[in-house]
Amino acid sequence: MKKEVFLDKVKNGIIVSCQALPGEALYSEKGGIMPLMAKAAAQAGAVGIRANSVRDIKEIQKIVDLPIIGIIKRDYPPQKPFITATMKEIDELVATSCEVIALDCTSRERYDGLTINEFIKSIKEKYPNQLLMADCSTFEECKNAYEAGVDFVGTTLSGYTDESPKQDEPDFTLLEKLVEEKIPVIAEGRIHSPEQAKRVYDIGVDAMVIGGAITRPFEIATRFIKAIGEK
């Protein structure tokens, strides 16, 4: 899929992140749960899906006809990057034919010993037609990844690295700066409410991913329980 076609499909809509990790209530070794989440999202009018693991992506593709942002979360201790962190994950995701592959593009030390620029270059050389989304935490990381060759940047990791601000809302400042610089941006991270989603789109971002506020019952219930307890 070409970049312009993808952006046209997801523009001004909601891409729903459908993920569950081992230890979470909706995770199943047998699979079959995330496709139902994706189906519900599609019925609601979602314009895309973000999914983790080859299994979930393939299962979702069978029942939902929406573009997918694919990732593979795999730990490589002691290094911190775990979202599509090496070429092994890239190869696995390309084989699924997912429309976009998202990868950690932070400035943190990587398991493979490459700089993020070297990693992006190696991906583009091996898979020149694959769309890439850079999961970043700061403006500098976003700008660097975009200049290195990714198609879109995401604010996915803002608040989750030592270099980024800790807050319980979207990084509006980062989003505004990226839009000002005309860097294609997919907003993601701590978008908890429809009001916040509207504010994010008012900034002028190209697309938006929402996960926890829609597909993580534990987070949703916790937010309500915490709110009524604050009397």
From Swiss-Prot:
Record pathway: Amino-sugar metabolism; N-acetylneuraminate degradation; D-fructose 6-phosphate from N-acetylneuraminate: step 3/5
An example Gene Ontology biological process: N-acetylneuraminate catabolic process
Cellular component terms (Gene Ontology): cytosol
Catalytic EC class: isomerase
Record key words, sorted: Carbohydrate metabolism, Isomerase
Alphabetical list of InterPro entries matching this protein: Aldolase_TIM, NanE, RibuloseP-bd_barrel
Catalytic activity annotation: an N-acyl-D-glucosamine 6-phosphate = an N-acyl-D-mannosamine 6-phosphate
One Pfam family linked to the record: NanE
Entries under Gene3D superfamilies matching the protein: Aldolase class I
The protein's Enzyme Commission number: 5.1.3.9
MF-aspect GO terms: N-acylglucosamine-6-phosphate 2-epimerase activity
Keyword Metal-binding: no
Stated role: Converts N-acetylmannosamine-6-phosphate (ManNAc-6-P) to N-acetylglucosamine-6-phosphate (GlcNAc-6-P).
UniProt family annotation: Belongs to the NanE family.
Protein name: Putative N-acetylmannosamine-6-phosphate 2-epimerase
